[in-house]
């Protein structure tokens, strides 16, 4: 009988960054949201996130790595959702 590996805890997350003229978002998946955010802010994350102080706008726990990657794909295409999160960020920082 084949043994299954235990499901890995996975999260999908949305980061935000804003200044007076621009608002940016970044969507990704990870096993540890806090550690991943620290990597992004230390300049060791994805190239597109380097040089900015990112804020966690949204995170969602997923049942598996595969599900997290699927949710990431969908969130990257849901611009209205990310725009709403960024508007909330701009309101908080104003």
Identify the role of each PLM range.
Residues 1-55, 59-81, 87-94:
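GIY-YIG nuclease catalytic motif and its immediate N-terminal context
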């Amino acid at each position: 009988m084949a043994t299954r590996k235990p499901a890995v805890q996975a999260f999908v997350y949305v980061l935000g960054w804003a200044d007076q003229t621009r608002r940016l978002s970044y969507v990704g998946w990870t096993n540890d949201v806090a550690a991943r955010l620290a990597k992004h802010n230390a300049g060791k994350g994805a190239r597109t996130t380097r040089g900015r102080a990112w804020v966690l706008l949204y995170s969602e726990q997923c049942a598996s790595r595969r599900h997290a990657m699927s949710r990431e794909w969908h969130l990257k295409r849901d611009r209205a959702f990310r725009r709403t999160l960024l508007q909330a960020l701009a309101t908080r920082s104003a």
